[in-house]
Amino acid sequence: MNIAVVGLSHKTAPVEVREKLSIPEPQIESAIAQLASYPHIDEVAILSTCNRLEIYIVTSEADQGIREITQFLAEYSKLPVLSLRQHLFMLLHDDAVMHVMRVAGGLDSLVLGEGQILAQVKTTHKLGQQYNGIKTILNRLFKQALTAGKRVRTETSIGTGAVSISSAAVELAQIKVANLAACRVVILGAGKMSRLLVQHLISKGAVEISIVNRSRDRAQELAKLFPQQPIKIHPLSEMMSVIADSDLVFTSTSATEPILDRVKLEMVLEVQRSLMLFDISVPRNVHADVNELENVQAFNVDDLKAVVAQNYESRRKIAQEAEKLLEEEVEAFDIWWRSLETVTTISCLRNKVETIREQELEKALSRLGSEFAEKHQEVIEALTRGIVNKILHDPMVQLRSQQDVEARRRCMQTLQMLFNLDAEEQFS
């Protein structure tokens, strides 16, 4: 069996490609079902965020499994395989294991050390289990990755002062305008990213903030989190009129198509009116054609890289500390992985000994008579089970703990010969 990951991220693909391969949560179930139906995919998990799409699989034939994922991605994105392939990365076993650890630890994020990714990996694990994509191997891998991510956050200072996509967008806005306090700011959307936007805008001095959202209740819940700030709430029907009176617009909605484009802005903006748009959504909320308007500037998540680069340089040493922790978690997973080879032998031995125990117990109880057997069966059964477990405990622990592959296989062969076991290897 092999673990493989195929995906693309902010490192390998521009936002125009990433938005075509964003799989929203309501579509995860059908995507897992389709991938799991392929003949060479035994387990599957999907991690989809604004900056990455990664598909993790367990497969007996890595080349075939990777080919099936690539075909799925081409069909989903409606991009030709040759065009798509240049944006994909493909990693096998040890590299795939280290990769998911780095992702969970925030070391592969656009914003080094950002905290949201750990929750997203947790969601990937939960949905993979819920929709029957994740079984024994990926379950262990994602549990180990979540442990790794938590260790990175608690045992290093990588999370202290780390910026997020939202804070990077606000920082970029601060670079582009002279004074945030003098700007009328609109946020489209009322989710977690929008909450972070409000938080960072207030910390940078913004005072006039409006939220436009489809659900008024959700927007009001967000506004209540900042009681010291008079935040205005507007329904979606007022979006364009609110934008027309604004200086800065931040977009963070779950829309799958652009909600702002050149035509819409032309209809409401005065001729000399300047406007800056910061789109942190993937798929994008703002169409690229708005940049054709003379006094309009639009920025997307890929434009945040310059801001993020400064953050990375100051945090490189912390990242190196985190890498050492990840190596420990990779080793822990690898020890477990290697122990899988012993599962069949141990299972066969247990079954054989259990069969003998049950047969001998039945003989003993029949000799003791029904009255005695009924009265003491539970005690005698517990006694025999305890003896069997204690006898088997040390050999099983020793077998699992053999680090050397050849030594472990010799131990298995010895057990199989001594106990006349019919065990076939399932893992190689």
UniProtKB/Swiss-Prot annotation:
<keyword id="KW-0149">Chlorophyll biosynthesis</keyword>
<dbReference type="GO" id="GO:0050661">
    <property type="term" value="F:NADP binding"/>
</dbReference>
<comment type="pathway">
    <text>Porphyrin-containing compound metabolism; protoporphyrin-IX biosynthesis; 5-aminolevulinate from L-glutamyl-tRNA(Glu): step 1/2.</text>
</comment>
<dbReference type="Pfam" id="PF00745">
    <property type="entry name" value="GlutR_dimer"/>
</dbReference>
<dbReference type="Pfam" id="PF05201">
    <property type="entry name" value="GlutR_N"/>
</dbReference>
<dbReference type="InterPro" id="IPR015896">
    <property type="entry name" value="4pyrrol_synth_GluRdtase_dimer"/>
</dbReference>
<dbReference type="InterPro" id="IPR000343">
    <property type="entry name" value="4pyrrol_synth_GluRdtase"/>
</dbReference>
<keyword id="KW-0627">Porphyrin biosynthesis</keyword>
<dbReference type="InterPro" id="IPR036343">
    <property type="entry name" value="GluRdtase_N_sf"/>
</dbReference>
<feature type="binding site">
    <location>
        <begin position="114"/>
        <end position="116"/>
    </location>
    <ligand>
        <name>substrate</name>
    </ligand>
</feature>
<feature type="site" description="Important for activity">
    <location>
        <position position="99"/>
    </location>
</feature>
<dbReference type="GO" id="GO:0015995">
    <property type="term" value="P:chlorophyll biosynthetic process"/>
</dbReference>
<protein>
    <recommendedName>
        <fullName>Glutamyl-tRNA reductase</fullName>
        <ecNumber>1.2.1.70</ecNumber>
    </recommendedName>
</protein>
<keyword id="KW-0560">Oxidoreductase</keyword>
<dbReference type="InterPro" id="IPR036291">
    <property type="entry name" value="NAD(P)-bd_dom_sf"/>
</dbReference>
<dbReference type="GO" id="GO:0008883">
    <property type="term" value="F:glutamyl-tRNA reductase activity"/>
</dbReference>
<comment type="pathway">
    <text>Porphyrin-containing compound metabolism; chlorophyll biosynthesis.</text>
</comment>
<comment type="subunit">
    <text>Homodimer.</text>
</comment>
<feature type="binding site">
    <location>
        <begin position="189"/>
        <end position="194"/>
    </location>
    <ligand>
        <name>NADP(+)</name>
    </ligand>
</feature>
<dbReference type="InterPro" id="IPR018214">
    <property type="entry name" value="GluRdtase_CS"/>
</dbReference>
<feature type="binding site">
    <location>
        <position position="109"/>
    </location>
    <ligand>
        <name>substrate</name>
    </ligand>
</feature>
<comment type="function">
    <text>Catalyzes the NADPH-dependent reduction of glutamyl-tRNA(Glu) to glutamate 1-semialdehyde (GSA).</text>
</comment>
<dbReference type="Pfam" id="PF01488">
    <property type="entry name" value="Shikimate_DH"/>
</dbReference>
<keyword id="KW-0521">NADP</keyword>
<dbReference type="GO" id="GO:0006782">
    <property type="term" value="P:protoporphyrinogen IX biosynthetic process"/>
</dbReference>
<dbReference type="InterPro" id="IPR036453">
    <property type="entry name" value="GluRdtase_dimer_dom_sf"/>
</dbReference>
<feature type="binding site">
    <location>
        <begin position="49"/>
        <end position="52"/>
    </location>
    <ligand>
        <name>substrate</name>
    </ligand>
</feature>
<feature type="binding site">
    <location>
        <position position="120"/>
    </location>
    <ligand>
        <name>substrate</name>
    </ligand>
</feature>
<dbReference type="InterPro" id="IPR006151">
    <property type="entry name" value="Shikm_DH/Glu-tRNA_Rdtase"/>
</dbReference>
<dbReference type="InterPro" id="IPR015895">
    <property type="entry name" value="4pyrrol_synth_GluRdtase_N"/>
</dbReference>
<feature type="active site" description="Nucleophile">
    <location>
        <position position="50"/>
    </location>
</feature>
<comment type="similarity">
    <text>Belongs to the glutamyl-tRNA reductase family.</text>
</comment>
